[in-house]
Amino acid sequence: MPSGRLQQQFIRLWQCCDGKTQDTTLNELADLLNCSRRHMRTLLNTMQARGWLTWEAEVGRGKRSRLTFLYTGLALQQQRAEDLLEQDRIDQLVQLVGDKSAVRQMLISHLGRSFRQGRHILRVLYYRPMHNLLPGTALRRSETHIARQIFSSLTRVNEENGELEADIAHHWQQISPLLWRFYLRPGIHFHHGRELEMEDVIASLTRINTLPLYSHITKIDSPTAWTLDIHLSQPDRWLPWLLGQVPAMILPREWETLANFASHPIGTGPYAVRRNTPNQLKILAFDDYFGYRALIDEVNVWVLPDISEEPACGLMLEGPIQGGEKAIESRLEEGCYYLLFDARTPRGAHPQVREWVSHVLSPTNLLYHADEPLQQLWFPAYGLLPRWHHARPGPGEKPAGLETLTLTFYREHIEHRVIARIMSALLAEHQVHLHIQEIDYDQWHAGEIESDIWLNSANFTLPLDFSLFAHLCEVPLLQNCIPRDWQDDAAQWRAGEMNLANWCQQLLANKAIVPLIHHWLIIQGQRSMRGLRMNTLGWFDFKSAWFAPPDP
């Protein structure tokens, strides 16, 4: 019998007997465990051989045998829990222990670095699962980061300085204003073993042609081996950066036929997905990666939803602290939480409503009414970027007849709930009821349901001149809520003729967007980890991090 099953049987027997020595029979014990008399004898003999109990059998009708426990069920449960932790069986651990606070403490004690069978393993604690990792779909901040570890694209944007680097394409050039040529590396392999072919690249880039930022791609072909031509309907100085973004990651052309591809995707990146469940995401270093092999062999993201109730619920790498090993990496996000007024509803489009609501729900009001732990993580926002001060809050008078407003945000985000509660209380002081809708991220991203205002957040990556417009333009919700010629804006941006600061100031001037809070991103880690540089998404590049060996 497998060790885990035997441990479960012992714990159950110990609980049924209250851990006390007693005189009993095989039949009585078999009834307790719902098994046959013969199987019960086998269980007792095996448990006795393990040193967990003694079974003094008496032969004869009416005679009772003595059962003595040498090991407590609690001790064995703890041992079983440790075994499950080492095996990364978090779902079974939660079932075994039951108490989520106890599970949390056990997980934290095993965070950080682990060295098993010659492999470096990093364990991370996160507050929600990541079910969808499919490029070109609605991905949140963390899914975007993980996708970058799994997939490759024609180009790559350096997370630290925003500079463009080679990836699948080793060189590229602009042949004419409407034609770019990329030269691809041969011999690249997908995680499932097949070699990447030009058809995979063409299929991957063709499938995203419906997205706004890629809609100007008119034709993709290969004039010669490992050479890719991309034809455009309008010039685009940002095209090489655009092809380094997650939607343009390269998938095997048969991806739609592969089981559970969104949660278990296959790419050509430095890490391959081994497991993705509600309790754990495990990715392994890909030995056949065409770039430098990752130095951390395995990354385990353990999911414990209850940690989202804490204000600093981002990324935890902190294991047992030894000799002042704890380190905290932090940065103020390049982006903010903001309110988005929906021009499709009468209240959302009303200038006086926008003016008054933005006054009542000002950054300083939100910060003042927040709990102290959140006040340490929040910074008032007066522009989409921390360095900008575009917002001009006015006094505003409450519009006559305003009695209710609808606010919508996406699930699994504790700070959205906190901000919404503060907003509800502030508006209630003025006899306005805030109706709150909490929806799935896909629904929020599409923005097709009715709401007066939406609670959003944006994290812009480097280079900001590229990502600020690209991020806002690629979210259908914003295009639905803000009536303007987005295609004309995109043409100006592609041509390098857009003044982004002025463009953002226009959005803030009519209160279409109202910045609320900049957030401090935090990674709680260990000083033994090298190469950990937090990116603008609040994560770090796994393949570039490594562990310093202990002092001899």
From Swiss-Prot:
Keywords: Activator, DNA-binding, Repressor, Transcription, Transcription regulation. The lineage of its organism: Bacteria, Pseudomonadati, Pseudomonadota, Gammaproteobacteria, Enterobacterales. Residues 163-493 are annotated as: Solute-binding. GO terms for molecular function: DNA binding; peptide transmembrane transporter activity. PANTHER family: HTH-TYPE TRANSCRIPTIONAL REGULATOR SGRR, PERIPLASMIC BINDING COMPONENT OF ABC TRANSPORTER. Activates the small RNA gene sgrS under glucose-phosphate stress conditions as well as yfdZ. Represses its own transcription under both stress and non-stress conditions. Might act as a sensor of the intracellular accumulation of phosphoglucose by binding these molecules in its C-terminal solute-binding domain. Residues 1-116 form the HTH marR-type domain. Residues 26-49 bind DNA. One of its GO terms (biological process) is peptide transport. InterPro entries: SBP_5, SBP_5_dom, SgrR_HTH_N, Tscrpt_reg_SgrR, WH_DNA-bd_sf. This is HTH-type transcriptional regulator SgrR. NCBIfam families: PRK13626.1.
